[in-house]
C-alpha cells in the first residue's frame, strides 16, 4: 500500500470550521471518484499554531495507481478548483506503509 500525504494550510480568512466544511464538501465528492482509491482520511491539527492546518491521506495499491487517479482530467480539475476554495498551500508526499503495530494485545 502507498499513502499520498497532503499537508494543507488553510486560507487565512477562513475559520477552522469554515475550512473543514469546505474541505469535506464538494472536494470530497471528487475524491471519492478517484479510480483505485482504497481510503481517504482527513486530519485537522490541534494546538495554537501548527505548521499545517490539516493532513489528507489517500491510500492506493501503488504509487502508479495514485498518479493515474490524480491524472484523470475531470477529477484533477475538480479537485484543484475545490481545493482553491479552502487551501492556501498544499505539499504532497508519497509514503510506503510499514505496519509495526496492527492490533493492541490485552
Give the predicted meaning of each segment.
Residues 1-106:
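Macromolecular interaction modules
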